[in-house]
Amino acid sequence: MDLKSLIRDVPDFPKPGIIFRDMSPLLQNAEALSFVSHNLLKHVDLTHVDYFAGIESRGFILAAHMAATHKKGFLPIRKAGKLPPPTRKVSYALEYGTAEIELPPGRGNVVIVDDVLATGGTLQAAIDLCLLAGYSVESVAVLVNLTFLNKMTYNDQKVASLVQY
């Protein structure tokens, strides 16, 4: 399936010089969404996975759909201040300043899911957060990997993705 044809390029958004990869058309296509849920993690033995952890906000959509497809639980990795206590928090650097994400503490094996991997800062923070909160990270997966911006790996494996730019 040609997923790239379902990802809209939005030039100069959110600021000049940036090409935003809008996955809204893909999400509106039930066949494509099902394809993503069934094929993004073909390399992962899901029998040991308890949860799909989605990074706010577009990672929620993919992770929740994958969790339902594979009959697993869903964990929301949220911006700080959005979840009731207790939570664990991790700070990470942004282009201008810092951000915090949080997750309830717990146990189990997770696959972390997000829509786009750019520099890897948010994804690395999500990995660190899951470990801090008591979870074991089995794998990480993104729909789109902007490979020209990162060479990120996890446990000596490339981050799973279905679309690369």
Swiss-Prot record:
Q: What class of enzyme is it?
A: transferase
Query: Gene encoding this chain?
Result: apt
Keyword Chaperone listed: no
**What phylogenetic lineage does the species belong to?**
Bacteria, Pseudomonadati, Bdellovibrionota, Bdellovibrionia, Bdellovibrionales
InterPro entries tied to this protein: Ade_phspho_trans (IPR005764), PRibTrfase_dom (IPR000836), PRTase-like (IPR029057), UPRTase/APRTase (IPR050054)
Question: What UniProt keywords apply to this chain's record, in alphabetical order?
Answer: Cytoplasm, Glycosyltransferase, Purine salvage, Transferase
**Where does it reside?**
Cytoplasm
Q: Which family does it belong to?
A: Belongs to the purine/pyrimidine phosphoribosyltransferase family.
Q: Name one GO biological process term.
A: adenine salvage
Q: What is this protein called?
A: Adenine phosphoribosyltransferase
Note the CDD domains from the entry. Answer: PRTases_typeI
Give a yes or no for keyword Acyltransferase in this entry.
Answer: no
Q: What is its main location?
A: cytoplasm
- From the Swiss-Prot or TrEMBL record, what is one GO molecular function term? AMP binding
What is the source species?
Bdellovibrio bacteriovorus (strain ATCC 15356 / DSM 50701 / NCIMB 9529 / HD100)
Could you describe the subunit structure of this protein?
Answer: Homodimer.
Superkingdom as given in the UniProt entry: Bacteria
Which Pfam families does the record associate with it? Pribosyltran
Catalyzes what?
Answer: AMP + diphosphate = 5-phospho-alpha-D-ribose 1-diphosphate + adenine
**A cellular component annotation (GO) from this entry:** cytoplasm
The family database entries (HAMAP family) matched by this protein are listed as: Aden_phosphoribosyltr
Pathway(s) of this molecule: Purine metabolism; AMP biosynthesis via salvage pathway; AMP from adenine: step 1/1
Query: What EC numbers are recorded for this enzyme?
Result: 2.4.2.7
Record's function text: Catalyzes a salvage reaction resulting in the formation of AMP, that is energically less costly than de novo synthesis.
